[in-house]
Design a protein with these regions (language model features):
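Active-site hotspot residues in diverse enzymes, especially metal/ion-binding acidic/histidine motifs
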Residues: 1-203
Length: 203
């Protein structure tokens, strides 16, 4: 598997935003159409204890969503569905050429699986792409309240604005260094202060 730097993943997602004139909360299914990808629902068995939410069939230019988990995928205006489709667009953008050239093997025949919680590097790349696509850094920065801020309501409001679930929003904010959680697991603006750092420069 080829290593893809996170900044490259962010840049590829930003290119899609620019090329397709996307806005916050955009219609992921319309984006699939514009990318020339189809979408179907079909029953897919979970694998090895992992919940399979979706698949990409790159040779058929087709995204498959698992109808066995339709209730979960469609909760809260389909937020997990949006994230799963973003994940499959990530596979298409990052991995489809390598698959077609034979330099990247598929996980199962001619399908790439989207397993919930998978730590496979290829899956992690697609996960990072989905986060960058649905919560682009520049748009998220402009939506943040000025620091300092504290509490879950800020994270919930941003999740509602970007049509994603709260957990991926919190992870995205933490990864960008715009939020950390205190000892009570409460979101707080900014990066966490390293233990003892407060005492380095006493007032």
């Amino acid at each position: 598997m080829t290593f893809i730097p996170e900044r490259r993943i962010e840049a590829l997602a930003a290119e899609i935003w620019q090329r397709h004139a996307l806005e916050v909360g955009f219609d992921v299914e319309q984006l699939l159409d514009e990318l020339g990808l189809g979408l179907v629902w079909e029953a897919v068995d979970d694998e090895g204890g992992d919940r399979v939410l979706g698949q990409l069939l790159p040779t058929k230019r087709l995204v498959v969503l698992n109808e066995r988990h339709i209730e979960l995928l469609e909760e809260k205006d389909g937020r997990l569905r949006r994230y799963t489709v973003g994940h499959e667009i990530g596979h298409w953008t990052l991995h489809a050429d390598a698959i077609r050239s034979g330099t990247l093997s598929l996980f199962d025949g001619e399908r790439i699986w989207c397993r919930d919680g998978s730590r496979d590097p290829v899956e992690r790349q697609a996960e990072m792409f989905s986060a960058a696509l649905l919560m682009p850094e520049d748009r998220l920065r402009s939506a943040l309240p000025p620091p300092p801020w504290r509490g879950w309501p800020v994270v919930y409001r941003l999740a509602d604005q970007f049509l994603v679930n709260v957990t991926p929003m919190a992870i995205r904010l933490e990864k960008l260094g715009w939020m950390h959680r205190d000892e009570d697991d409460t979101p707080v603006s900014g990066r966490a202060v390293a233990p003892g750092q407060q005492e380095l420069f006493p007032g």
